[in-house]
Amino acid sequence: MEISVASVTVSVAVVVVSWWVWRTLQWVWFKPKMLESYLRRQGLAGTPYTPLVGDLKKNFSMRAEARSKPINLTDDITPRIVPYPLQMLKTHGRTFFTWFGAIPTITIMDPEQITEVLNKVYDFQKAHTFPLGRLIATGVLSYDGDKWAKHRRIINPAFHLEKIKNMVPAFHQSCSEIVCKWDKLVSDKESSCEVDVWPGLVSMTADVISRTAFGSSCVEGQRIFELQAELAQLIIQTVRKAFIPGYSYLPTKGNRRMKAKAREIQVILRGIVNKRLRAREAGEAPNDDLLGILLESNLGQTKGNGMSTEDLMEECKLFYFVGQETTSVLLVWTMVLLSQHQDWQARAREEVKQVFGDKEPDAEGLNQLKVMTMILYEVLRLYPPIPQLSRAIHKEMELGDLTLPGGVLINLPILLVQRDTELWGNDAGEFKPDRFKDGLSKATKNQASFFPFAWGSRICIGQNFALLEAKMAMALILQRFSFELSPSYVHAPYTVFTIHPQFGAPLIMHKL
């Protein structure tokens, strides 16, 4: 009997181990090689597959090397931000594949194909390739299918244009506070001094999203922003290890720190939500800001058309993070480029004076700022908040003249496309806001050559919010100051989810 039990145990163990080995080989070798063969038969060029790691090691190595030294102001930033995709573009042409671990990733530069990918949201879905990113937020940005559609429908009213116009006084209040702080710094130094504008812009945009979306001051939400920034840095430091299967579940020191920060964010947010619920019960809270709309949806969850409490928390985390990140990077690169191009700074200031004089900017006037709109579009073209988007294919799909198998990723290289000389001309790398003087459609020839906020039905829900906030900030700054690059400024754009200035943005501010 004992021999029989032992035999069965050994047999079961052999079967389990054999199954595990087969599945591992399938994942690490057979499936990737099958997909590689499929893509090469389509005529696609790409890198040979390296088991398990793919091109991640080369990608990380080139990025680390690129970040190790700053660049000149007039240099192309693409070799510093996306060095590996840029090298592959030069080697293999405008459509090629590389390897994200064991997953082939097809990079496309053709605007028609990009439009197709971004318009077919149910076929080309979000690529969930970076599990640690979920610690910062998930929300509508990362959902697919019916859940994405439901959340988008619920959130949309908070970002209607008329609703955003009503937020302009809050924009003014938050922006005025940082401008007044800079004014005092400059006044104390006899009308000119060096100011690193980056921390101030981060604080200002954090305050705006706190006031407008959550009905609280930045003091209440400041800890959330700090924790999310710390979490983002920890994730970037861990990025190489994050692609090891199961790594995020290991009790490493880094993982414990990240999860502790994520838990603290959750606790603070729950406190903000509970505070709003108590205010609602007392009839003292708005229902039409983002948090009010989310809570209204949560109360209707039992009918099947609202959000769960967990979903609500994720949307709050997402808008705290994205609402602050997107506008702060847009503003910092606008100030850097206007410091470099004094003629455009003068034109923007003259327009602000013509529209507002010394009066407080209002929504109607902000929408009349054509020169400022051109400048912001050009900044978004040269310094998009994120350098690339990715999508996943789960079944065989036609894309242009290609037939792509399920199980591959699509990379949409925003930065490379928006600086592409074939699409934008030989001056694609130069700061020339005049290219937008006749509007976006004319500048882009109605094609997806400009998509800093994505495209189609998944276009960033907060793009109008971000642009109006940026116009308010720049109008107030231009009314009070002229500015130029400080001798201590070091040009080193790098990616921490969005494109940041690695060493800040010290400018010489002159009081007008």
Swiss-Prot record:
<dbReference type="GO" id="GO:0016020">
    <property type="term" value="C:membrane"/>
</dbReference>
<dbReference type="InterPro" id="IPR002401">
    <property type="entry name" value="Cyt_P450_E_grp-I"/>
</dbReference>
<keyword id="KW-0479">Metal-binding</keyword>
<dbReference type="GO" id="GO:0016705">
    <property type="term" value="F:oxidoreductase activity, acting on paired donors, with incorporation or reduction of molecular oxygen"/>
</dbReference>
<keyword id="KW-0472">Membrane</keyword>
<dbReference type="Pfam" id="PF00067">
    <property type="entry name" value="p450"/>
</dbReference>
<dbReference type="GO" id="GO:0005506">
    <property type="term" value="F:iron ion binding"/>
</dbReference>
<dbReference type="GO" id="GO:0004497">
    <property type="term" value="F:monooxygenase activity"/>
</dbReference>
<dbReference type="InterPro" id="IPR001128">
    <property type="entry name" value="Cyt_P450"/>
</dbReference>
<keyword id="KW-1133">Transmembrane helix</keyword>
<dbReference type="GO" id="GO:0020037">
    <property type="term" value="F:heme binding"/>
</dbReference>
<keyword id="KW-0408">Iron</keyword>
<keyword id="KW-0503">Monooxygenase</keyword>
<keyword id="KW-0812">Transmembrane</keyword>
<protein>
    <recommendedName>
        <fullName>Cytochrome P450 72A11</fullName>
        <ecNumber>1.14.-.-</ecNumber>
    </recommendedName>
</protein>
<comment type="similarity">
    <text>Belongs to the cytochrome P450 family.</text>
</comment>
<dbReference type="InterPro" id="IPR036396">
    <property type="entry name" value="Cyt_P450_sf"/>
</dbReference>
<keyword id="KW-0560">Oxidoreductase</keyword>
<keyword id="KW-0349">Heme</keyword>
<feature type="binding site" description="axial binding residue">
    <location>
        <position position="460"/>
    </location>
    <ligand>
        <name>heme</name>
    </ligand>
</feature>
<dbReference type="InterPro" id="IPR050665">
    <property type="entry name" value="Cytochrome_P450_Monooxygen"/>
</dbReference>
<feature type="transmembrane region" description="Helical">
    <location>
        <begin position="2"/>
        <end position="22"/>
    </location>
</feature>
